[in-house]
UniProtKB/Swiss-Prot annotation:
One of its GO terms (biological process) is cytolysis. The chain crosses the membrane at residues 79-103, 114-138. Changing K45Q: Forms an inactive homodimer; strongly reduced ability to homooligomerize and mediate plasma membrane rupture (cytolysis). GO terms for molecular function: cell adhesion mediator activity; cell-cell adhesion mediator activity; lipopolysaccharide binding; membrane destabilizing activity. Residues 44-55 are annotated as: Helix alpha1. It comes from the Eukaryota. Disruption phenotype: No visible phenotype in most cases. Some mice have dome-shaped heads and die within 2 months after birth. Mice show abnormal behavior, reminiscent of obsessive-compulsive disorder: mice exhibit compulsive grooming-induced hair loss and self-made lesions as well as increased anxiety-like behaviors. Mice are prone to systemic chronic inflammation in the skin, liver, kidney and pancreas. During inflammation, reduced motility of bone marrow-derived macrophages and protrusive membrane dynamics are observed. This is Ninjurin-1. Residues 58-74 are annotated as: Helix alpha2. Glycans are attached at N60.
């Protein structure tokens, strides 16, 4: 076995700059040398927002069902039905708005003002939805507890 100027390790050659050597550059995920596609990023962002919107829509539908099951005897029946209905309508509106945002080309400078307005509108509506849902939670939506033990 010859011992030259090369450095050998159990797993092979560790020349400077070779993969695995201490001075090698860390591997990059994907191709970061190309410019970011703004449309692709916006579409992913809108898809994620839409999924969260659907989850909240399902939660509000479940809350509405629980309130209706409690009936008119519940102290906060009317306010909760109104707040949940407002939240549901706003969520559907934001969902439609997100669909329109995905359809527009972000690389077209002529549409930037309109897209900026629609994006700000969606953000404002999401803020209102959050505030409405805070009030829904504050009024408390829970199913009535049935007494298991007989009363005497």
């Amino acid at each position: 076995m010859e011992s030259g100027t090369e450095e050998y390790e159990l797993n092979g050659d560790l020349r400077p700059g070779s993969p695995g050597s201490p001075d090698a550059l860390p591997p990059r995920w994907g191709l970061r040398n190309r410019p970011i596609n703004v449309n692709h990023y916006a579409n992913k962002k809108s898809a994620a927002e839409s999924m969260l919107d659907i989850a909240l829509l399902m939660a509000n539908a479940s809350q509405l069902k629980a309130v209706v099951e409690q009936g008119n005897d519940f102290a906060f029946f009317v306010p909760l039905v109104v707040l949940i209905s407002i939240s549901l309508v706003l969520q559907i509106g934001v969902g439609v708005l997100l669909i329109f945002l995905v359809k527009y080309d972000l690389n077209n400078p002529a549409k930037h003002a309109k897209l900026d307005f629609l994006n700000n509108l969606a953000t404002g509506l999401v803020f209102i939805i959050v505030v409405v849902n805070i009030f829904i939670t504050a009024f408390g939506v829970q199913k009535p507890v049935m007494d298991v033990a007989p009363r005497q």
